[in-house]
């Protein structure tokens, strides 16, 4: 276990591709981890394949953690106001927000539903984090906030989001930053680019 102080951490989208790897890392560092995941296929894969992927990710988590623990998984929408009960009960030290529509074509197909997850859900989590004194909020954005780029980009370069997915991700960054300005909520923003690997769904690689 690392020498870091043990924390109680909420990972939204913790059964997703990236989230499942994050959960394993945190648990193996000795942190207490809870997962929120709505287990939605977003029309990318059918239910049978989704169930298989979720099972693979769950057992992937269970098999890669060094100490066997009770892992709390909550199947609930991040925009649901009832999350307040969970936040008040658990008093999380940190929130890592990965839950989102997974890619641009899914948001384009249903932008209204996309905004509920990517905007309303984020705002709900930020407000609950403020109300329960969460120490740090980590927001997983996207490299798509830079717009079309052909070479490597640095984090300080100008953003030019194009398309509803990228715009909502960038708007999310501004919301997170505003909660720091107004309420002192410490934050980290991460902009992953072209992430792939074990436990991802196959269509991302071949599409």
Where are these regions (language model features)?
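N-terminal Rossmann-like NAD(P)+-binding domain of SDR-like oxidoreductases, especially those catalyzing
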Residues: 1-193
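Glycine/proline-rich active-site loop of Rossmann-fold NAD(P)-dependent oxidoreductases
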Residues: 170, 188, 195-207
